[in-house]
Structures are given as structure tokens and as C-alpha cells.
Amino acid sequence: MRFRMFSRVSIWVAVVIVASSCSKFRRISKSEDWRVRYEAALNYYAKQDYYRASMLFEDIMPIVRGLPEGEKVEFYLGYCQFYEKTYLLASNQFKTFYETYGRSSLAEEAHFMYAFSLYSSAPSANLDQSDGIEAMDAMQNFLNKYPDSKFQERAAEVIRVSQGKLEEKGFQNARQYLTLRMYQAAIISFDNFRKNFPDSKYLEEIAYLKVVSQFNLAEKSLVTLQPKRYRAVIDLYQELVDSYPESKYLRDAEKMYSLSLAKVTEKKEVKS
């Protein structure tokens, strides 16, 4: 019984507090003195109430533009949007800031946060990486402009992770052709991947998958095309062995190599 009464009292108190808070915010937002709204916005920001802070910052931004307070309002608004996870809004706000206040002591941080907001908006590796490419370019531009920045390590990490996502997506796309049994397209895609990512962790697997793709292509080819394509399997197998003599894929690749060798030998015997 006491517990129920305590629960009801607690709920009632919570409702009163929320109602009071909303009422206070409404009074502040309707104040004709922008300084009242400005100080309240800073207070909400300090308390990590970024939603209310952003509403007040946006409200007074046209009024304070050109005043000393205007710089802080536009800068903090970017962070409010970032913490609210509206990353594209944040990136646009930070970009506007450093373009408008290029000589500000906060311009460097705003430039970094512009790129970091783009990076934060980029999806996982299995989805389209257009935003990731834009974020990587933006962060590289930041490092070019501020090579000794205190954000240098974080910027380099963003580029590294973004590059990793692009690499992962590129590998998935290339392997998809093999899954779809589009073997010639798979081989071309694997070659393009190696050119684009010469230091990739997937190069060994790609060398093996090229053998798989070429072997399947030969198997499905017209009889007249098979000798040349089986010889290509043999060449790709040799490349795999030369590049990765301890590869875990060698046993499986060797089976395709042996079958291809037998097919080529068989064709020669028939010809003779």
C-alpha cells in the first residue's frame, strides 16, 4: 500500500517538474529580450539539453548575426545538431561557420567537425558509400589546411576507417558478380579492386576467387573457347602460388588447376 502511494506521489512530482520545465521554456522562448534567450540557450547547452538549446539558438541567430554573440550561437548550434544526431544539418552548420568566421579561433574546430559530421552520417560498409567518400575528401582537405592540428590523429583515423569501408564495399561488389555467376564481370571487378586497393587485406582471397571465376567461366564456355580459358586458370593458379605460397586456398585451387591442366592436355591430344 505504501509502495503504491509512493509510486503515485513520484509520478505526480515528475509530471509537475516536466510541466514546470515546459512552462519555463515557453516563457523564455517568448521573451522579447534576446539576451534572456541567449543565456538560457547556453544554460540548456551546459546541461546537455541540446534540443531546447538548439531551438533558442536558431530563434536568436538572425538577431545576433554580426554581434560578438553571433559567432558563439552559430558554433554551438552546430554542436547541438551533432549531439542530436542530425549529422547533415550539423555538417552544413559547421561549414557555414568556418566559411563565415574564417579568422575565428573556432574555425579550425568547425572545419574538423564539418568533416566529422559527414563521416558520422555515412552508413555501414554494406550500403552506399557516397557520404563516406565525401567525408574522406573533406577530412583530407582539413589536414591539408591544418597539418599540425590538435585534431590530426582523429582526422587520420576517420580517413583510415572510411577507406576501410570503401575497401569492404568494393570487395563485396566484386564478389557479388561471382555469386551471380557473371564470371567475366567478376574477373574484371577483381582486377579493378586490386588497382584501387593495392594494399588490401583481401588480395589473397581475390587471387583465389579469380581462379574460381576463371575456372567456372571455362566450364561454361563454348568448346572452341575452352582451351584458352583453361590455360588462363593455370596461369592464375601459378600467380596465386607465387604470391601466396602458404595460402589456405591452395588445396581447393589446386583441384581446379589439375582439372584445367587435364582439359588442356586432352584438347592437345585430340588435335594431334
What name fits each language-model region?
Residues 9-17:
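Sec-dependent N-terminal signal peptides
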Residues 2-6, 18-272:
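Acidic, polar-rich low-complexity tracts and alpha-helical solenoid repeat scaffolds
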